[in-house]
């Protein structure tokens, strides 16, 4: 079907609401916009769907949400008895999130699949926990995480509480594609409730149990009881779903001196105080830093709209504020967990940590120093969730901690996605431990570098929007795959990992990577440095990860800057 036909079909055949019709009519004389909205369908993958809000096949809207839900229902109904376990639905503070969540519940009800719909916005980790706690067959979160406000998304979770894997995503996609837009009916809400196909859930059903479980993750609860009231923290939920659970967990473990950025406390679908609601963006911390200076806090927490990611800012020795990178936060938490458990005599002999392949190699050194095995996965926290399940199924290892450089952290097994509530609790505990020793979180980070070496990690993104951008990304990856660099910045490429082929090639020898296939290229360099290239799974970007290390901070930073310049040329 050509784009013009698809546009006309949407406009005249099934777009039933006035807003969608008005949106379509507004682009009637804009062929480029029509092309972008209708040249392809919004893709569904392991990260679900994510896109710009608006009318069209390639946009996030209630018609794509309903169609995706009908496809998911068909997929689940391949086993009708299991489908009766139901699907849990959560949503964040974005535009249309509540409406999309309601539509999702009522499409499921129409198909005979029970829906558990939260009574208000909830973070990703509570959804993940709820799927497991309620023994549901699946879960859905309406969110676009940290994307700009014009985006929304639809993430699907399997019965273990982790995002669906590639095989399930492919199966769901096949059912979605075979579903006409006109074949996505909604059951009346009152009828769905009367038939037991729609249940509204809240604190009593899920949240209270989740918070109780998170409290068990404290490694030194007595330390929190002694030092918690002395610690001054500034927290911003950046207008998202973390406001209630993060403040609650901190309060219940004894951290009472938490100042919340009032301008960012309440839900705001436009995220009007920031350019992007992203806790790795310095702009998200401007108001928090102002408040921290006013109240004398030395630590700032920020969670993104769906509260699966945590950003941290710390006061340095000279009084400046420094934002910790996701890699630094991950290494602080890993080192604290392992060192504290070692001192307590509770570090298991079969302990394991897990990180993504694009996360810092510093974590490998830390884990090795405590005799803990580090496992690596592809990007996407679902793969960390898979490893947790493997450990439990086989009894081979005890999971201790998992993280991604993109500010996602987890130390529990009762949640299977990154957890900003869990991470907030642990960083607060580390801050208390530091205070008890007369040092700061910043000092703790520097002590890790002094012990293991200085590691610098940078991510460079090249945005390539639209149909042409997608083609260009494929060309770049094809060229690099066929003609990999032999050296970068004067350093020899010692090995090439091609995750699409599933191979690692070094000195003419080829061995399997042991990971699922994915369009990722990883160039190992001398002295433990490396560069990784991959297309983003959620945005029209190609990402370049540059990791360097040296015994001296300045040397590590200069090497990283030089290597970035050399590596960026690969994307031209």
Where is each model-derived feature located?
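An N-terminal, well-structured beta->alpha segment
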Residues: 7-104, 192-230, 241
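N-terminal small/polar loop signature for handling phosphorylated ligands or for N-terminal nucleophile
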Residues: 88-151, 254-312
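Short Gly/Thr/Asp-enriched flexible loops that form oxyanion-binding sites at enzyme active sites
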Residues: 100-108, 151-158, 246, 308-327, ...
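Conserved phosphate/anionic-ligand binding catalytic regions in large, soluble enzymes, centered on
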Residues: 38-58, 144-147, 233, 237-249, ...
């Amino acid at each position: 079907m050509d784009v013009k036909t698809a546009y006309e079909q949407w406009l005249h055949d099934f777009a039933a609401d006035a807003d969608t019709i008005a949106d379509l009519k507004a682009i009637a004389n804009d062929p480029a916009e029509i092309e972008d909205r209708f040249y392809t369908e919004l893709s569904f993958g392991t990260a679900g769907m994510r896109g710009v809000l608006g009318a069209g096949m390639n946009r996030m809207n209630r018609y794509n949400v309903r169609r995706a839900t009908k496809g998911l229902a068909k997929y689940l109904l391949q086993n009708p008895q299991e489908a009766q376990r139901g699907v849990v639905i959560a949503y964040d503070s974005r535009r249309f999130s509540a409406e999309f969540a309601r539509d999702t519940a009522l499409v499921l009800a129409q198909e005979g699949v029970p829906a558990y719909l939260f009574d208000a916005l909830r973070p990703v980790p509570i959804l993940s926990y709820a799927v497991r706690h309620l023994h549901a067959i699946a879960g859905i979160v309406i969110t676009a995480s940290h994307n700009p406000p014009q985006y929304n998304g639809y993430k699907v979770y399997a019965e273990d509480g982790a995002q669906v894997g590639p095989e399930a995503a492919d199966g769901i996609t096949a059912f979605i594609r075979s579903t006409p837009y006109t074949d996505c009916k909604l059951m009346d809400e009152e009828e769905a409730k009367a038939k037991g196909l729609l249940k509204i859930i809240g604190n009593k059903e899920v949240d209270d149990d989740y918070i109780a479980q998170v409290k068990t993750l404290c490694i030194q609860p007595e330390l929190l009881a002694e030092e918690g009231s002395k610690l001054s923290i500034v927290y911003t939920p950046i207008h998202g779903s973390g406001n209630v659970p993060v403040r609650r967990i901190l309060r219940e473990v004894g951290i009472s001196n938490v100042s919340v950025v009032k301008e960012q406390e309440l839900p705001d679908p436009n995220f009007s105080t920031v350019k992007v609601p992203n806790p790795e963006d310095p702009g998200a911390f401007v108001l928090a830093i102002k408040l921290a200076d006013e109240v004398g806090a030395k630590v700032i927490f920020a969670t993104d709209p769906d509260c699966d990611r945590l950003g941290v800012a710390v006061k340095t020795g000279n009084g400046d504020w420094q934002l910790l990178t996701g890699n630094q936060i991950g290494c602080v938490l890993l080192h604290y967990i392992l060192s504290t458990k070692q001192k307590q005599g509770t570090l298991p002999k079969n302990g394991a940590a897990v990180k993504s392949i694009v996360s810092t190699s510093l974590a490998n050194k830390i884990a090795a120093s405590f005799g803990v095995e580090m496992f690596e996965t592809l990007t996407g926290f679902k793969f960390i969730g898979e490893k947790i399940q493997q450990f439990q199924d086989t009894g081979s290892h005890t999971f201790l901690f998992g993280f991604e450089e993109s500010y996602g952290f987890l130390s529990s097994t009762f949640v299977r996605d990154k957890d900003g509530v869990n991470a907030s609790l642990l960083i607060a505990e580390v801050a208390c431990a530091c205070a008890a020793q007369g040092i700061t979180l910043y000092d703790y980070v520097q002590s890790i570098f002094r012990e293991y070496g200085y590691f610098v990690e940078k991510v460079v993104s090249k945005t390539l929007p639209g149909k042409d951008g997608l083609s260009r990304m494929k060309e770049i990856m094809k060229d690099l795959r066929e003609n990999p660099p032999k050296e970068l910045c004067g350093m020899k490429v010692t090995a090439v990992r091609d995750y699409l082929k599933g191979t690692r090639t070094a000195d003419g020898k080829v061995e399997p990577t042991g990971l699922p296939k994915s369009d990722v290229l990883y160039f190992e360099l001398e002295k433990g440095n490396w560069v990784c290239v991959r297309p983003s799974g959620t945005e029209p970007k190609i990402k370049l990860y540059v990791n360097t290390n040296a015994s001296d901070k300045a040397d590590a930073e200069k090497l990283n800057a030089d290597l970035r310049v050399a590596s960026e040329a690969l994307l031209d």
